[in-house]
Amino acid sequence: MPVIRVRRERLESLTGLSIGELEELLFRLKCEVEEPEEGVLEVEVNPDRPDMYIGEGIARAVKGIAGVEEGWDPPELADTPLSLRVERVPQRPYIAAAVVYGVNVDELFLEELIQFQEKLHDSLGRRRAKIAIGFHDLAKLPSASVEYRLMTLDTRMKPLGYGGSEMSFREFLLADEKGSLYGGLATKDNSHPFLLSGGEVIAAPPVINSEITRVEPGTRDLFIDVTGTSAELVAKTLDIIVASLAEREGARVGRVRLEGPGAVWASTPLLSEAAAKLDPGTVSKALGVDLTPEEAALHLRRMRHNASPAGGLVNVRVPPFRVDILGEVDLVEDIAISIGYEALGPRWPGKFHGGSLRWETHVYRAVKDLLVGLGFTEVLQLVLTSPRLVEAAGFSSMAVEVLNPVQQEYSVLRPTLLITLLQTLRENQHRRKPVKVFEAGNAVYLEDGEPRDEEKLALGVLDEEAGFEDVQAPLYAVLRIMGVDFEVEEASHPMFMEGRTAAVKVGGERLGYIGEVKPEVLEAFGLEYPVAAAEISLEVLARWTSRT
């Protein structure tokens, strides 16, 4: 959870509320507040609210839920002389920029601004891999024309924090910790993205800014750039930053014109609101409270949406900084937060239905317990297996193949558990004899051209002289204990020897097969000892097992 450090006095000044009121309201907004040192608050913010990673964003949310302000007034976008030419930068193709006038940076706000930048880098930016942010002193820009393009690693710049010393970007990557952390994110074939103004490098995103445009106490206006690998995320991040800085008293937002072959937008920031509709009936079903469209709209406005009733529904315009709003359910959650979960109160449901196990599950568990009691060990294998083994088992015509397998050895769904059972016996054939194992799981096979998923049970015995009776006896014991009347008849099976194979039937329905594995199958699976095995359908068994 992101923890935001902010001066208590500053937050009280921004909201007009006492620390006690702030703690209560922030708790409703899913935040926790601590004061580890006098005058400094640590606010643990929910990670889906990056708009609250700075004092202005926290204040905006708190004033809304407190009823001090409602909705959100988008700032007017003023034209500026700034233009940004975007060349093609394959490894980091997207860039957006904006100007915010009247920010008036002081020592305390500079600390928060840097913190805001790094929290966004770590969360939305995935440690700068997705997006990176640059803050620049607008007055220090060498030119109103800015350019974003690839240049070689030998390009010289004045990295931030080096007192104006000039070095090549290659030298910086080797000398600075940020070079080792972020240098590989956009470096490719001896080239890297650079941001230039008046022919001078003002940034090498996502690694470092230049000393030329350093932001410091006394900076009045900011030029902001956001670069990244996702156009949507770049635009949203810039909107979050601009909307937060626009909350500062006297601040104004200016647009930057974008041009060139790599430009995605004509100008930025976008600051566009998303349109949505909410049915108060949905709120009632989810929260158990009946709200009129007017009441629902009021609660949404307190959560800083622009909302109004319309024909029994609520028209909602979601502000661009609320990137956590993905659908109707998120708006319902906002209403719950506005009302207060403590005000909703618990209520017993009109009907109560207790969960219980399926009858089939009871049968499956009983069978497994019986086999363990008969000296068998349960194993678990993957449903995916090798097409070579499926062919060796004689089940190729029934196999369901994976269209895009990661490995060829795991490209077919097992049509019978006997395949993976023999694999297990192969891996354990040099252990103390007899080796007795079973598996209950899913087999997937083609039936009338369509894939069918069936729960089955397979058991096998590997021994120096393993025979039909070694599996017949435990299987018969299980069926009799389960109260199943069954009959056995001679049959054929692709994996079992002729004359040593039997089909088990229950009520005329085939339950499964018992048999001794063919020598050629043993050889294909790498088995050096005889194996007797059986496979039955647990689904059929459950249908014919008495419920008494």
From Swiss-Prot:
Enumerate the SMART domains for this protein.
B3_4, B5
The residues listed in the UniProt record as binding Mg(2+), with positions renumbered to this chain, are 324, 330, 333-334
Q: Which GO terms describe its biological process?
A: phenylalanyl-tRNA aminoacylation
Q: Which reaction does it catalyse?
A: tRNA(Phe) + L-phenylalanine + ATP = L-phenylalanyl-tRNA(Phe) + AMP + diphosphate + H(+)
Enzyme Commission number(s): 6.1.1.20
The identity of this protein, by name, is Phenylalanine--tRNA ligase beta subunit
Q: Keywords assigned by UniProt?
A: Aminoacyl-tRNA synthetase, ATP-binding, Cytoplasm, Ligase, Magnesium, Metal-binding, Nucleotide-binding, Protein biosynthesis
Any one GO MF term held by the record is: magnesium ion binding
User: Which compartments does it reside in?
Assistant: Cytoplasm
Oligomeric and partner information:
Tetramer of two alpha and two beta subunits.
One Gene Ontology cellular component annotation held by this UniProt entry: phenylalanine-tRNA ligase complex
Q: Show where the B5 domain sits.
A: 271-346
Pfam families referenced in this protein's UniProt entry, alphabetically = B5, tRNA_synthFbeta
Needed cofactors? Mg(2+)
SUPFAM superfamilies listed in its UniProt record: Class II aaRS and biotin synthetases (SSF55681), Putative DNA-binding domain (SSF46955)
Q: Which family does it belong to?
A: Belongs to the phenylalanyl-tRNA synthetase beta subunit family. Type 2 subfamily.
